[in-house]
């Protein structure tokens, strides 16, 4: 009976399989290194210390509160809040756009109301909030402060680099635009890849930046 039982041969050495395992390990290490550097790349903190600050009014309330903290210790003479029509809830809000809503929020957070001016855009977030806001700011500066050639843009977390890119593209090389990234409460700055919201926001902003930076 034993003569008919065949023993399974030991698995032979497979160099191709080991090579694939090594390549996979290297790939995982590279992805981990890359993920640790994606957020800082998307969310730079590089102000030019101009006299004017431009605030992305579509930031969440807690991000606007952090913005107010940064503004409190600054030398900005004027603060422009930007943003288009509210994406939802406008029927129940006394503020028709993010610019005016952000202005009111900053005032509640302690920012001097005399230093804040709302500069509303004409489009919603889905229709191109950043570009429309850049156009509105450019128009306001041309009409009211034509001598201004540099300012700092306060933008939400990983959207900061893309926001500066769009503002620079809209206003042109005659403007020097700094950027200050305001952390978002629900998006970890380091281990963002471990949360669904982090993956959605950071991954989405990375793709959006590539789309806006590379002409098609």
Name the predicted role of every residue range:
Residues 10-13, 85, 89, 202, ...:
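Amphipathic, soluble alpha/beta structural segments
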Residues 39-194:
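A structural signal for short, hydrophobic/glycine-enriched beta-strand patches
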